[in-house]
Amino acid sequence: MEKILFYLFLIGIAVKAQICPKRCVCQILSPNLATLCAKKGLLFVPPNIDRRTVELRLADNFVTNIKRKDFANMTSLVDLTLSRNTISFITPHAFADLRNLRALHLNSNRLTKITNDMFSGLSNLHHLILNNNQLTLISSTAFDDVFALEELDLSYNNLETIPWDAVEKMVSLHTLSLDHNMIDNIPKGTFSHLHKMTRLDVTSNKLQKLPPDPLFQRAQVLATSGIISPSTFALSFGGNPLHCNCELLWLRRLSREDDLETCASPPLLTGRYFWSIPEEEFLCEPPLITRHTHEMRVLEGQRATLRCKARGDPEPAIHWISPEGKLISNATRSLVYDNGTLDILITTVKDTGAFTCIASNPAGEATQIVDLHIIKLPHLLNSTNHIHEPDPGSSDISTSTKSGSNTSSSNGDTKLSQDKIVVAEATSSTALLKFNFQRNIPGIRMFQIQYNGTYDDTLVYRMIPPTSKTFLVNNLAAGTMYDLCVLAIYDDGITSLTATRVVGCIQFTTEQDYVRCHFMQSQFLGGTMIIIIGGIIVASVLVFIIILMIRYKVCNNNGQHKVTKVSNVYSQTNGAQIQGCSVTLPQSVSKQAVGHEENAQCCKATSDNVIQSSETCSSQDSSTTTSALPPSWTSSTSVSQKQKRKTGTKPSTEPQNEAVTNVESQNTNRNNSTALQLASRPPDSVTEGPTSKRAHIKPNALLTNVDQIVQETQRLELI
């Protein structure tokens, strides 16, 4: 008996341990079975949670992913909280068994996308909280099973759009929080059937306008502070770059609680408070067609591209009207692009006529006519001499529906066509094409390439041989979009005539033309170098001539100045010459004697320095006429004076060389006598001797000789 009780006790402990996970708090009192595992440092969902749990709290942990088995068979769970974890992945159908779940909190995690089957099976979910994640994508069918939602919070994410079609089906939705995202457009009519909506928050997005939805028309109070009364509808749209034109006039006419919103455009209203702008300033600009195709001629079966561009405020929508007066949309042979271009892939004779381009916006509309001419190809005559033409049938480019963007089928056809022709390389002026199509058309003569630019609708044709695999298109405009098609020209075996067939088309844009550095061409470089070298030579010659002229002028001025000085000195010296002067000098005069010796040596210079030597010698002679010589100079001086007396008896008309010889001999005698006397003179005593007399030189003869020397010097300088 005791053993049985012991076993029952162990079984009870084991059951209790299995029901409540470790570290968690379990409230097992019926009917509120709750498992509280918040802030327990869990890395994953505990596997031993009681499947009868009604409320499960796993917030503030470190759970990284949700598996299919984590919440399997928990059909009684009503409230699931997974907030503030690190969840980045949720396995598809992970919540499929939670058919009674009312609230799911996944806020403050690391989710980046919501897949199609993530919330499958949550048909009774009322509150879905996904704020403060990193969501960038929500699949189009992600909310298909949560149509009973009453509150959807997608705030503080990175969403540019959400599946608006799924939102339209949430008829029970009363709170939608989309604030602090990057949503730039809300389709018109999205909230038309959401009659229970009481709060819409689109604060801090990229919305430039809000559609005039009936939901907003019912609004009585626009709340930007977030405080609303139960009976009112609150719209919060502050922090958006509103474009204040006539499209927001309906919003301006509604009541409001504050005036915090401002306009971001147009420029005249930038920065102004939305509610303070008068209604008459909410203006729109009517459309104006700025560029369109005037006329186009194409061969039957070729591709025709009609262009139409317009501007206005707001941006006008462009649609086309066929010659039959019907609205054109995407079909098997026609494509209407968002930029206003109409592309007829294969033309027929019935397409000839006037197509109408219509640009419209809330301010009005503008129209332009484009004439399309289809050149008919000849066909084979049958036996009854009637022309046999294939029946093109009704024109399938005319429909009664409004034109829109490209359908998936048309995108596939375009992609298939573009795969046949590839732009291998495109520059600002050229494009290299490669052909990938198979040449299965018999009798091909050649290929025809036709293209036209965005700014020039005139077709340009090029013919290439059928064996070509590449083709280089030249002379293109920079930064221009081109539509290029390749047609096969072949011999039709049935009609025995030449026919054409479109092989493929492609659209490409050339690069922008930037200023680039190029090397100078060799011809231009050679001519430039010759001009530069010639200029340097001419400049050098001019500088050399100028230097010579300046030097000659300076030398000429100096020569005239020195001649005058020499003549004056000699005239003064000869005029005031002292004959037979003998004076005894003290020892201190020896320095003057040495200076006199150096001046005597200076007089031996060449004829180029005669002017300077004459000036020096004359100045020294004039200075020594009034000074006495030392005794050591007596013997040499007396001998030189005797020689001068002998030569002085000759007439003054002797040749010039004799006068020069006398001067040189006199200087030589002075140097020799000075050298001998300085060598024999004792250092501490000065002997006195008889004084010597200088030789007399006739003033007129000496002046004549000096003038002749100066003239000869000037002649040599000129040479």
Swiss-Prot record:
Residues 414-503 form the Fibronectin type-III domain. It is a single-pass type I membrane protein. Residues 385-414, 615-694 are annotated as: Disordered. One of its GO terms (cellular component) is glutamatergic synapse. GO terms for biological process: negative regulation of inflammatory response; negative regulation of macrophage activation; regulation of presynapse assembly; synaptic membrane adhesion. Residues 18-529 are extracellular. Glycans are attached at N73, N330, N339, N382, N406, N452. The keyword Repeat applies. Residues 551-719 are cytoplasmic. Residues 393-414, 615-627 have a biased composition (Low complexity). Disulfide bonds join C308-C357. Residues 1-17 form the signal peptide. Keywords: Disulfide bond, Glycoprotein, Immunoglobulin domain, Leucine-rich repeat, Membrane, Repeat, Signal, Transmembrane, Transmembrane helix. Residues 18-51 form the LRRNT domain. The chain crosses the membrane at residues 530-550. PROSITE patterns: IG_LIKE, LRR. SMART domains: IG, IGc2, LRR_TYP. Can form heteromeric complexes with LRFN1, LRFN2, LRFN3 and LFRN4. Able to form homomeric complexes across cell junctions, between adjacent cells. Does not interact with DLG1, DLG2, DLG3 and DLG4. Belongs to the LRFN family. Cell adhesion molecule that mediates homophilic cell-cell adhesion in a Ca(2+)-independent manner. Promotes neurite outgrowth in hippocampal neurons. This is Leucine-rich repeat and fibronectin type-III domain-containing protein 5.
